[in-house]
Amino acid sequence: MTQDDVFVTPHYADHRRAAGFLNEMVRSIEAQTDPHWRLIIVDDKSPDPSAVERLRAIQARDPQRIQCIFMPEHVGQGVCRNVGVNWAKRIGAAFVLFNDADDVSYPDRLERVRSEFERDPDVGLVYSTFEVIDEDGVQVERHRLGEPIRQILDAQSANAPRGYDAWKRIGTETGYANLTSTTAVRTAVAIEYPFFCMTAEDSNAWYRMSGGGVKFSYVEAPLAKYRIPTDIKGSQDRARVGESYYFGKMIAEIAGFFAATDMATGRGEIDSQEARQLEKDFFLRLSRTLRAEGAHSLADRVSSRASDGVELAQNVRKARS
């Protein structure tokens, strides 16, 4: 008998389009070709006073398969995902599929992901390429995409990171490679490597998963639609927290990558010399990424003053210990 597996959605309604985006997301889950799904929506203390009533109405549509949890205070989408993952564990789900509230899953997403996990029991994380849509659900042409998104798509089409050491190429070559709404993880893996940070929490978690020995698998067909409203600069997170996003992103990436090198070194997968070279290459790649996103002062700091990068990494390591 096929078990139910769980779509995990953090929800924070803080703009006028949130209700429509949420409904479109839920409809995409209800349209899955594989009927063995559950959906857990974790509301992050949305400022929209109508959000609670709206979510309860969605749950009432299919209370056996759709559940909503309401956080008593705003904790960030990473913590909300952790709450959803723990709920999935309690009902015995083998894996979770992350799906942000403004993104859309293809109808065959669950079917394709289940097939990948069954095909290779060693795989712990599955991700795919994606289609970019605007606020109206219309596909965004490539020339209108920001450089960071184009870089992700280029890296995927050339040679998407996969296998047991995906963290190395993600950190030193491609940068962020798997959008959260395209990513599915075995529940046990998601429990072992929870989301920690408020910014770039997904990137940080993927580094730790891969560095901890989790095998990544990549599906070349798009399984999700990633929404970028045309009148909002950057992601919803970036619009909300402003320029501090880039500093937080830098710290989260450094923390995740150095955690991966520490774990790989501890397992004997790499020696200290290779670890130092990987860390150097990581800072060079991070500088390029920050510059592409317009964070030029941070990019200069990372690239031209290597000691700052080392100091940042050392401070992050101290904070973790």
What is the predicted function of each stretch?
Residues 24-36:
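Short, acidic, metal-binding catalytic loop of nucleotide-sugar glycosyltransferases
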Residues 43-54, 73:
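A conserved acidic beta->alpha catalytic loop
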Residues 49, 103-116:
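Acidic donor-binding/catalytic loop of UDP-sugar-dependent glycosyltransferases
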Residues 71-91:
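Glycine-rich, basic loop-to-helix element that forms the pyrophosphate-binding segment
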Residues 93-104:
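Short beta-strand-to-loop acidic/aromatic patch adjacent to the donor-nucleotide binding site
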Residues 110-149:
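Conserved donor NDP-sugar-binding/catalytic core segment of glycosyltransferases
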Residues 153-240:
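Conserved nucleotide-sugar donor-binding catalytic segment
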Residues 214, 222-230, 235-268, 303-308:
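Catalytic core of nucleotide-sugar-dependent glycosyltransferases
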